[in-house]
From Swiss-Prot:
Belongs to the phosphoenolpyruvate carboxykinase (ATP) family. ATP binds at residues 213, 232, 248-256, 297, 333, 449-450, 455. The modification N6-acetyllysine is found at residues 87, 523. Ca(2+) binds at residues 149-150, 152, 283. This is Phosphoenolpyruvate carboxykinase (ATP). One of its GO terms (biological process) is gluconeogenesis. CDD domains: PEPCK_ATP. InterPro entries: PEP_carboxykinase_ATP, PEP_carboxykinase_C, PEP_carboxykinase_N, PEPCK_ATP_CS. It comes from Escherichia coli (strain K12).
């Protein structure tokens, strides 16, 4: 165990933390394991050992991110660059915070951390040394230190010796803000960022993902301004060095489809694309575990072992896990270091330029085809739309689809206007000669979800080039190019109209969905570039 390793209380005092007695610096996994299972711990600090060897923790009432409690200091650094919640047509979570309120929140967190035994983890965000962030995480909770050790890139001893942080994350999960009403904030909880001080503050929420996605939001600010694409996607590479990226919102299949025994994983959630190629921001994976089974997702199941950290799962008395129990939350998760997956890119999670760009959508309306090949304008249109839909059950068992449009398949994490991400992505794609595809992993007219077997065969056809050589026909209204046949895929499902009792049924649902697309895209028409893309979308 390295305690301090040259990190002094004085360095923490520079951030406003005083009276530091004990710094546990970059703790080993073995030490974290002992700390988390310390029988004297109470409440959400306490970990429970499971039969798989991984420790499980509870994150309290926050079992997901708290977007309504996210704030960014509006000052000279950010005023003219950030995509603000109170400007323009697009709705987002980037609520402005005054420098005065920031100082108040910072005082709350530093007082919470002062006089405590602190865990400090220094790690990298970004696998490219030229553009990575050196991040210092400070917390009083052992498992939160474990979470960031899993999720970020672990520096070597040599890198730690010369580590100079670019960004500080102070996690004061145990403190809240009693003055939130007078300050015009959403609640007593807060996740706040200051780009001038290069710091994130967390108060009131124990959810580990706030640290992960907080740094993603920062990369989403810094990289596109340098012409580097910053993407909410998974990525993998084939035997010939061919790289594919998979964009998609939560639950559309990013982690599942990119974890492919035939290809090496670059990463499952956050990537950049620069002059050298595609690189992971992270050093770990954060997989959903609801209804996880060894049969359906063996790689993820086998990654849950010692050093993995489970969140909000139900652990039985005997230490076994009920993965089917979503009573705490449907968003049960596990974080693990990326090397828990066997088939990964080593030693650094990066590869060459992507030639296949896949947009995953789970269309609960049953309108979109399982796969279509996009033109350059359609690529931008569907990237900015970021569509998926969930099935929400109602009391009588009728299931109505709920549409979600999330710009760039990750609106919650965007720091700049969505068109800036689209422009950078398109430039990178054009330079690499990349082709985009829209893949529907959702439902069709039968009311059943498209099988994972068919979806995997579709992904194979995209990656091995057979889809590009297939004959296509055009789906009306959406003007999408669909292959007439693909190896290993039931031909009947390729045209979504065939899965309905009559084409009129599809037509009716298609009109509903097309209108939703058109209404959503209106917010991008306030720029000439956005207005020009309307023609690439559906037409009624």
């Amino acid at each position: 165990m390295r305690v301090n390793n040259g990190l002094t209380p004085q360095e923490l005092e520079a951030y406003g933390i005083s009276d530091v007695h004990d710094i546990v610096y970059n703790p080993s996994y073995d030490l974290l394991y002992q700390e988390e299972l310390d029988p004297s711990l109470t409440g959400y600090e306490r970990g429970v050992l499971t039969n798989l060897g991984a420790v499980a923790v509870d994150t309290g009432i926050f079992t997901g991110r708290s977007p309504k409690d996210k704030y960014i200091v509006r000052d000279d650094t950010t005023r003219d660059t950030f995509w603000w919640a109170d400007k323009g047509k697009g709705k987002n979570d980037n609520k402005p915070l005054s420098p005065e309120t920031w100082q108040h929140l910072k005082g709350l967190v530093t007082r919470q951390l002062s006089g405590k035994r602190l865990f400090v983890v220094d790690a990298f965000c970004g696998a490219n040394p030229d553009t990575r962030l050196s991040v210092r995480f400070i917390t009083e909770v052992a498992w939160q230190a474990h979470f960031v050790k899993n999720m970020f890139i672990r520096p070597s001893d040599e890198e730690l010796a010369g580590f100079k942080p670019d960004f500080i994350v102070m996690n004061g999960a145990k403190c809240t803000n009693p003055q939130w009403k007078e300050q015009g904030l959403n609640s007593e909880n807060f996740v706040a960022f200051n780009l001038t001080e290069r710091m994130q503050l967390i108060g009131g929420t124990w959810y580990g993902g706030e640290m992960k996605k907080g740094m993603f939001s920062m990369m989403n600010y810094l990289l596109p301004l340098k012409g580097i694409a910053s993407m909410h996607c998974s990525a993998n590479v084939g035997e010939k060095g061919d790289v594919a990226v998979f964009f998609g919102l939560s639950g559309t299949g990013k982690t599942t489809l990119s974890t492919d025994p035939k290809r090496r994983l670059i990463g499952d959630d956050e990537h950049g694309w620069d002059d050298d190629g595609v690189f992971n921001f992270e050093g770990g994976c954060y997989a959903k575990t609801i209804k996880l089974s060894k049969e359906a997702e063996p790689e993820i199941y086998n990654a849950i072992r010692r050093d993995a950290l489970l969140e909000n799962v139900t652990v039985r008395e005997d230490g076994t896990i009920d993965f089917d129990d979503g009573s705490k939350t449907e968003n049960t998760r596990v974080s693990y270091p990326i090397y828990h997956i066997d088939n990964i890119v080593k030693p650094v999670s990066k590869a060459g330029h992507a030639t296949k760009v896949i947009f995953l959508t789970a269309d609960a309306f049953g309108v979109l085809p399982p796969v279509s090949r996009l033109t350059a304008d359609q690529t931008q249109y569907h990237f900015l739309s970021g569509f998926t839909a969930k099935l929400a059950g109602t009391e009588r068992g009728i299931t109505e689809p709920t549409p979600t449009f999330s710009a760039c398949f990750g609106a919650a994490f965007l720091s700049l206007h969505p068109t800036q991400y689209a422009e950078v992505l398109v430039k990178r794609m054009q330079a690499a000669g990349a082709q985009a595809y829209l893949v529907n992993t959702g439902w069709n007219g039968t009311g059943k979800r498209i099988s994972i077997k068919d979806t995997r065969a579709i992904i194979d056809a995209i990656l091995n080039g057979s889809l590009d050589n297939a004959e296509t026909f055009t789906l009306p209204m959406f003007n999408l190019a669909i292959p007439t046949e693909l190896p290993g895929v039931d031909t009947k499902i390729l045209d979504p109209r065939n899965t309905y009792a009559s084409p009129e049924q599809w037509q009716e649902k298609a009109e509903t969905l097309a209108k939703l697309f058109i209404d959503n895209f209106d917010k991008y028409t306030d720029t000439p570039a956005g207005a020009a893309l309307v023609a690439a979308g559906p037409k009624l």
